[in-house]
């Protein structure tokens, strides 16, 4: 296999480390996630990473501020600010502030009713700003909620959207048939007609039961359906550091692609770095 630089399309960095259902919540456990990830970058030849802001829980409410402090110190990171869809802050004013801090996009979580309502309430002038400035929009959502994006993209087809974790189609304890895979992926796959929509092949541990079921064969049919619709040029590997480390070793987050028979070496090089580096203006 040829040697090439990797680029990670989905990591998190939290002050005091990730406090979800993780070993880092245990008393006395303290991890410097920045130093930890930088050591992984060196060991596994990672050139750049998209840092996905998340401030939707009390323990990480100041995550945007933490990332803003890191941006000038970490040239390898491209940070996306977490946008609370129910915030009272003027959105254009907020976007300009984030741009001044060095963010290159926004991170949206669209699951609950209020979040769906917040998405529907975004005005055209905001989408225009995001479109004209070429900002990346990382979205965590699932199922039929992906259909919410079609009317938005029809009006703003140059929005640069990246769907996280294969669009979170389901949690698989068995391998679905091809027909089942096609049906469950149809809301996301409807967005393939918009050329700036990308899909992150990330968070596989969250899609299989058990989570440590490497190489996650139960997800292969939905992965292949995504490949057939979007092509390898619009797929992005994301490790989902550091939550992934509760279930997998770091290299397992990308080694699974070498197990999937429908990816060739050229596909893997694009997915593991080339595509993201082009998106963020780095060398492919």
Region spans (language model):
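Hydrophobic faces of well-ordered beta-strands that scaffold small-molecule active sites
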Residues: 7-11, 49-51, 78-81, 106-108, ...
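Acidic/histidine-rich helix-loop elements
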Residues: 14-30, 172-174
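Alpha-helical scaffolding within the catalytic cores
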Residues: 31-37, 62-66, 90-93, 146-149, ...
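Active-site gating/metal-coordination segments in enzymes
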Residues: 58-144, 150-151, 204-206
